[in-house]
Amino acid sequence: MSLTLSELQIRTLKQTLESSKIPFKSEVRLDILSSFKIGGICPVVVEPENSNQVLETLFIFYKSEIPWKILGGGSNLLISDHPDNFVTLRLSGKFKEFEYLEGGKFRIGSATNTTPTFRQISQLGYTGAEFLSTIPGWTGGAVIQNAGCYGGELFDLIQTVEFLRNNEIFVRSPSEIKHGYRFTEFLNEKDSIILGIEILLKEGNLEEIQTSLKDKRDRRNSSQPENKKSAGSVFKNPKIFLENGKEIKAWELIDQAGLRGQIKGGAQISPEHCNFIVNVGAATAADVNYLVELILDKVFQTTGIRLNREIEYFGDIP
């Protein structure tokens, strides 16, 4: 277990941030920043508003030897019950904006909320991104995981990704970035920070776009736990196909293992969609992790298939 940050480290960090005029908050409950509504108190959350402030913040972290993690929309994340051995970086300001460029191109900041952002873009009469209006979280997180559903993936639309790596800002096309099903190279690079993207869409018929938005929203609501505290799909589909071409889904394997509705503390494997774990009470990260490990073990024992987590862990989780 990592040691907590010292009071001197925290006090010095706050003084440095104040003198640099970089926004931050103290003693932040991370559960309120998570769709799971799980997570403890972080000593400092730093909220840089532009690229220069991000670079300066990282310089401060490295100079002071302060461990840090970046947090986005918190929608596909399980946050530690005790996030007190690091500080959190959370982009703000210009990173929360998107703008139309020309010819169907949009520049989208990494801290934009995917659901309203891509709904607004679609309602401007541009088609191709309707599926993203059903995915919660922030655009930066969607980039990192190559988020997708209903046959579409974010990288199908991306023209360029702007990101920070090793204190340098890069702009790369999808062909220059390793990516695949719910995967990009950024997943394994904890020090890389997505700053924004440019996407290209086609003009479409607004009435058809509105219908598409509604159909996808209704489809999502009918197949997933509604108004429940969760982090979305817990496991990736294993990409295994039957002889008839039907894809085996993670939820089917979990159901086959007899785990639908299983409860640990305040967490439950959803009776409605068993690839979801929901917070039905005062669930802890430890409760959720117990169910995650249970699913991994039981599915392997039952089917011989090893599932891979889709949700990310944020901090130490026993």
From Swiss-Prot:
The active site is at R182, S233, E310. Residues 38-204 form the FAD-binding PCMH-type domain. It comes from the Bacteria. One of its GO terms (molecular function) is UDP-N-acetylmuramate dehydrogenase activity. The keyword Phosphoprotein does not apply. Residues 213-229 have a biased composition (Basic and acidic residues). Pathway: Cell wall biogenesis; peptidoglycan biosynthesis. Residues 212-232 are annotated as: Disordered. GO terms for cellular component: cytosol. Pfam families: FAD_binding_4 (PF01565), MurB_C (PF02873). The keyword Oxidoreductase applies. Keywords: Cell cycle, Cell division, Cell shape, Cell wall biogenesis/degradation, Cytoplasm, FAD, Flavoprotein, NADP, Oxidoreductase, Peptidoglycan synthesis. Its EC number is 1.3.1.98. NCBIfam families: murB, PRK13905.1. PANTHER family: UDP-N-ACETYLENOLPYRUVOYLGLUCOSAMINE REDUCTASE (PTHR21071:SF4). Cell wall formation. This is UDP-N-acetylenolpyruvoylglucosamine reductase.
